[in-house]
Amino acid sequence: MYGRSVQDCAYTASIGMIAQGQNDFAANGRIWLGLLAPHDRGRGLGLGCECLRPIKMSAVEQKPSEQPAPTTVAPDTVSTPEPAVAAAADNATAAPAPSETPATPAAPAAPDASGAQDTPATAGADSEVPAPTETKELVETKEPAEKKEPAETKEAPVEKAPVDDKTPITQLWATAKATGHPEIWGVTLADPETHVPTRIILQKYLNANDADLDKAKDQLTKTLEWRAKTKPLELVKKAFSKTKFDGLGYVTKYVQDGSTEPEAKEVFTWNIYGGVKSIDETFGKLEEFLDWRVALMELALQELDLASATKLITAEYDPYKIFQVHDYKSISFLRQSPQVKSASAETIKVFAQNYPELLKEKFFVNVPAIMGFVYAFMKLFVAPKTIKKFHPMSNGGSLAVEFADSKVAALGEKLPANYGGKGAELEEQGKGPLLE
């Protein structure tokens, strides 16, 4: 009898799976395990000089009167580019030959001692100034031209540009475009380089798969295909049976006045499974139940309003998530129908695949304390980061105290009275899928 009761308890706890199937929940494939447990947070120009040296040597061997010739050549060497300098030097070397012929008549002046003494001095001065000095200037004028080389290195960054097209985000964007469906969670997808909401969504798929790009691509593709087929945004406009779903699900939003920070807004989804009047009616038609549950989630995403998000997320920082509360008051954990089991399994599959990284924390309230052993058993198999998001509580009235650290002032007090707050009842402050 006890063995049978434990099994029934485990089956019954799987109702929690219906509430929200996140990628986190898929860690162990059994979200029901998180229902029951104690609370746990947890980079020389030698040519010019060599060309001018023959000019200097010729000037010394010539007579003083012939020295102006090099002087005429030197300026040309300074003002001409490298090829012209070589030509000027060749012309200058040939010039002294004709100038030596008129120099012979001028020989009588040579015996003049003073003239002979002045000539070396003059020659020395002329040879020192034009040749060395002009040569140095030539070298200096060519140095700037060589400095053009660094300009070529500036093209390096341009060569790296194509690499940016291979980042995980841009590859996911290419995958999304190839799929054809343009929307996820109410956001019309656009270039993530300029569209923050799209970048947030693509980053969530990377985060959900621990940065494994191939897995993220696969999940993103399946989500887009599922949304194209299911049309979740249309389900929000669809009216469901009041007899089957009245009072079973609500969405509430709490915002800190005067703040536009994403942390200053909290969105909740509430699943009141204790309000189920007929298991056969509510869970009998699986497709209908899933449509209703998806509509509730899409309403919460509308309140989260990712389309207006302006703050990028990372693997560690992501304020765009939702609180979930599942209330099991008045539910018997010793009985479970095939319909509920089927609904639980399919809901987990659909939500884990199509709504990753949207769960902030999940509270299971009014769960019998006797089922705490299931939570202890679950810790052996579920990843710690997932366990930290599950908070089973036997008393729903103590839920309000869990939000003392929220950026929304006095958030706990805004909750309904039966959850420890001072706010209006869910029927008044919350909204759910359309009913008729």
UniProtKB/Swiss-Prot annotation:
According to the entry, every stretch annotated as the CRAL-TRIO domain falls at 248-427
> What InterPro entries does UniProt report for this protein, alphabetically?
CRAL-TRIO_dom, CRAL-TRIO_dom_sf, CRAL/TRIO_N_dom, CRAL/TRIO_N_dom_sf, Sfh5
Cofactor names:
heme b
> Segment Disordered: which positions?
60-79, 87-168
Q: Where is the composition biased (Basic and acidic residues)?
A: 134-167
Keywords, ordered alphabetically = Cytoplasm, Endoplasmic reticulum, Heme, Iron, Lipid transport, Membrane, Metal-binding, Microsome, Transport
Q: Which family does it belong to?
A: Belongs to the SFH5 family.
What membrane topology is annotated for this entry? Peripheral membrane protein
In terms of CDD domains, this protein maps to:
SEC14
Q: What does this protein do?
A: Non-classical phosphatidylinositol (PtdIns) transfer protein (PITP), which exhibits PtdIns-binding/transfer activity in the absence of detectable PtdCho-binding/transfer activity. Regulates PtdIns(4,5)P2 homeostasis at the plasma membrane. Heme-binding protein that may play a role in organic oxidant-induced stress responses.
Matching entries from Pfam families are given as: CRAL_TRIO, CRAL_TRIO_N
Q: What is its main location?
A: cytoplasm
- Which intervals carry biased composition (Low complexity)? 87-113
Q: Identify the PROSITE patterns for this entry.
A: CRAL_TRIO
Q: Which GO terms describe its cellular component?
A: cortical endoplasmic reticulum; cytosol; endoplasmic reticulum membrane; plasma membrane
Q: Which domain of life is it from?
A: Eukaryota
Instruction: Establish whether keyword Membrane is in the entry.
Output: yes
- Where do the annotations place heme binding? 273, 293, 326, 328, 362
Molecular function as annotated in GO: metal ion binding; phosphatidylinositol transfer activity
Q: From the Swiss-Prot or TrEMBL record, state where the protein is found.
A: Cytoplasm; Endoplasmic reticulum membrane; Microsome membrane
The UniProt catalytic activity note for this protein reads: a 1,2-diacyl-sn-glycero-3-phospho-(1D-myo-inositol)(in) = a 1,2-diacyl-sn-glycero-3-phospho-(1D-myo-inositol)(out)
* Protein name in the entry: Phosphatidylinositol transfer protein SFH5
GO-annotated biological processes: Golgi to plasma membrane protein transport; regulation of exocytosis
